[in-house]
């Protein structure tokens, strides 16, 4: 960790706990800051806050009093807290800088950072880069939105390491000096508009990944995405395009049946075991970043010939009752679910539904035309049922939760079918996380066999 005096004796408010808030509070306290932690959950039911309090950190729980901003020089905000929260609005009005925990991580890290963002594919690409860099000169450390707190990793990493960090738009929006050595922008679709307020704001948040990059840094970007290409035209970083439709000699592309990088053969398409056409982009982006950071072709070939995906992302659960079951609980938007459906040629029974963010499912209708049956749950089940009717889906069934949907999916399916959980919605109406929803799916399949 860099020895920095920039936080010493500064009065800092950490707003919202969870894992990132707890880590940020502890890091700042260790760096000599005068820290106040504020969390909505009452202290009696808040073991994280109790722990920090025992460590000598001032804790205020149960409400967000505006007076907490008095005398504060910085607010470190949990990414899940929206910018229309009254205390955040007041902080901005007072001219107090509001950042997220990844900003802290970048300020204290001795290791260079490879940062990955995009509407879809972040976790798969992050996992690929980490695996590809294993055995290279610098040890990869995974961090960020993938579930490992960035500031915890940054304080332990050395200059001999490289931090591979998945960053969301929520996290990027709270950065001002964040500067990765390599940034990847996979794609930009309509997502999280309930949080950002508009697509323009969402795009602006994604663009912050390149805001502080310089010529000696690298921007790996999707040349097939017009919005992403526009970002590439505005950055000072060295552009490294990737494309699955065009030969881009300065970057990564597919030439017939071969994955190429800067004109050099890297791996044959037939050796790549990761399923789905959408994963071609993820492979091209990951191998570009890995090669730029010193990975060998041999290691990349090994990873791509053995890496079949990550949990909750088009994860093959197994075969039960002569049906093939897939867990794609991470698919929290229409584009992800569309990509999942397009990955199969066998008949599909789709399990979908979840939090209603007020959006339409009209864009899902073309993909639903490939689906034999749907089993729908959560707040959006009626909206999705309407979309399925318009798509001409023959069998439309409603369920209460994923657990109930699994049994109903078995009932409406036949031998050889694919039963696919790909919700197209966030989980928060019924489950705390998409992981919890995916685990409920897997456990319910196991329960069918008992």
From Swiss-Prot:
<dbReference type="Pfam" id="PF08245">
    <property type="entry name" value="Mur_ligase_M"/>
</dbReference>
<comment type="pathway">
    <text>Cell wall biogenesis; peptidoglycan biosynthesis.</text>
</comment>
<dbReference type="GO" id="GO:0009252">
    <property type="term" value="P:peptidoglycan biosynthetic process"/>
</dbReference>
<keyword id="KW-0547">Nucleotide-binding</keyword>
<dbReference type="GO" id="GO:0008360">
    <property type="term" value="P:regulation of cell shape"/>
</dbReference>
<comment type="similarity">
    <text>Belongs to the MurCDEF family.</text>
</comment>
<comment type="function">
    <text>Cell wall formation. Catalyzes the addition of glutamate to the nucleotide precursor UDP-N-acetylmuramoyl-L-alanine (UMA).</text>
</comment>
<dbReference type="Pfam" id="PF21799">
    <property type="entry name" value="MurD-like_N"/>
</dbReference>
<dbReference type="Pfam" id="PF02875">
    <property type="entry name" value="Mur_ligase_C"/>
</dbReference>
<keyword id="KW-0436">Ligase</keyword>
<feature type="binding site">
    <location>
        <begin position="118"/>
        <end position="124"/>
    </location>
    <ligand>
        <name>ATP</name>
    </ligand>
</feature>
<dbReference type="InterPro" id="IPR013221">
    <property type="entry name" value="Mur_ligase_cen"/>
</dbReference>
<protein>
    <recommendedName>
        <fullName>UDP-N-acetylmuramoylalanine--D-glutamate ligase</fullName>
        <ecNumber>6.3.2.9</ecNumber>
    </recommendedName>
</protein>
<keyword id="KW-0961">Cell wall biogenesis/degradation</keyword>
<dbReference type="GO" id="GO:0005524">
    <property type="term" value="F:ATP binding"/>
</dbReference>
<keyword id="KW-0067">ATP-binding</keyword>
<dbReference type="GO" id="GO:0005737">
    <property type="term" value="C:cytoplasm"/>
</dbReference>
<dbReference type="GO" id="GO:0008764">
    <property type="term" value="F:UDP-N-acetylmuramoylalanine-D-glutamate ligase activity"/>
</dbReference>
<keyword id="KW-0573">Peptidoglycan synthesis</keyword>
<dbReference type="GO" id="GO:0071555">
    <property type="term" value="P:cell wall organization"/>
</dbReference>
<dbReference type="InterPro" id="IPR005762">
    <property type="entry name" value="MurD"/>
</dbReference>
<keyword id="KW-0131">Cell cycle</keyword>
<keyword id="KW-0132">Cell division</keyword>
<dbReference type="InterPro" id="IPR036565">
    <property type="entry name" value="Mur-like_cat_sf"/>
</dbReference>
<keyword id="KW-0133">Cell shape</keyword>
<dbReference type="InterPro" id="IPR036615">
    <property type="entry name" value="Mur_ligase_C_dom_sf"/>
</dbReference>
<dbReference type="InterPro" id="IPR004101">
    <property type="entry name" value="Mur_ligase_C"/>
</dbReference>
<dbReference type="GO" id="GO:0051301">
    <property type="term" value="P:cell division"/>
</dbReference>
<keyword id="KW-0963">Cytoplasm</keyword>
């Amino acid at each position: 960790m860099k020895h920095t005096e920039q936080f010493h004796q500064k009065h800092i408010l950490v707003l919202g706990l969870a894992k990132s808030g707890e880590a940020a509070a502890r890091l700042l306290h260790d760096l000599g800051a005068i820290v106040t932690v504020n969390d909505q959950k009452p202290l009696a039911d808040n073991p994280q806050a109790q722990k920090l309090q025992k460590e000598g950190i001032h804790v205020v729980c149960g409400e967000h009093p505006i007076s907490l901003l008095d005398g504060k020089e910085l607010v470190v905000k949990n990414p899940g807290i929206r910018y229309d929260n009254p205390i955040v609005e007041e902080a901005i009005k007072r001219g107090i800088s509001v950042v997220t925990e990844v900003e802290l991580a970048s300020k204290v890290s001795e290791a260079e950072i490879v940062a990955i963002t995009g509407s879809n594919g972040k976790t798969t690409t992050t996992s690929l880069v980490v695996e590809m860099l294993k055995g290279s000169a610098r040890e990869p450390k995974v961090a960020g939105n993938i579930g490992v707190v960035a500031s915890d990793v940054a304080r332990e990493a050395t200059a001999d390491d490289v931090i591979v960090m998945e960053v969301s738009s929520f996290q990027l929006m709270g950065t001002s000096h964040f500067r990765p050595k390599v940034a990847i922008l996979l794609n930009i679709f309509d997502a999280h508009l309930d949080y950002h307020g508009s697509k323009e704001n969402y795009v602006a948040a994604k663009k912050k990944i390149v805001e502080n990059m310089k010529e000696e840094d690298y921007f790996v970007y999707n040349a097939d995405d017009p919005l992403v290409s526009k970002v590439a035209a505005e950055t000072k970083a060295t552009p490294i395009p990737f494309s699955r439709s065009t030969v881009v000699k300065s970057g990564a592309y597919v030439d017939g049946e071969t994955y190429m990088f800067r004109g050099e053969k890297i791996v044959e398409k037939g050796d790549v075991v990761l399923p789905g056409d959408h994963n071609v982009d993820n492979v091209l982006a990951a191998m570009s970043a890995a090669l730029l950071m010193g990975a060998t072709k041999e290691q990349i070939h090994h990873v791509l010939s053995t890496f079949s995906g990550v949990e909750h992302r088009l994860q093959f659960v197994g075969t039960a009752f002569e049906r093939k079951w897939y867990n794609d609980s991470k698919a929290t938007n229409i584009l992800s679910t569309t990509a999942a459906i397009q990955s199969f040629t066998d008949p599909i029974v789709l399990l979908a539904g979840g939090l209603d963010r007020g959006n339409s499912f009209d864009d899902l209708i073309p993909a639903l035309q490939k689906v034999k049956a749907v089993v729908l749950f959560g707040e959006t089940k009626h909206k999705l049922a309407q979309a399925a009717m318009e798509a001409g889906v023959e069998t439309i069934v409603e369920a209460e939760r994923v657990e109930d949907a699994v049994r109903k999916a078995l009932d409406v399916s036949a031998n050889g079918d694919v039963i696919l959980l790909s919700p197209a919605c966030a989980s928060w109406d019924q489950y705390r996380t998409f992981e919890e929803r995916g685990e409920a799916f897997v456990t319910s399949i196991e329960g069918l066999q008992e």
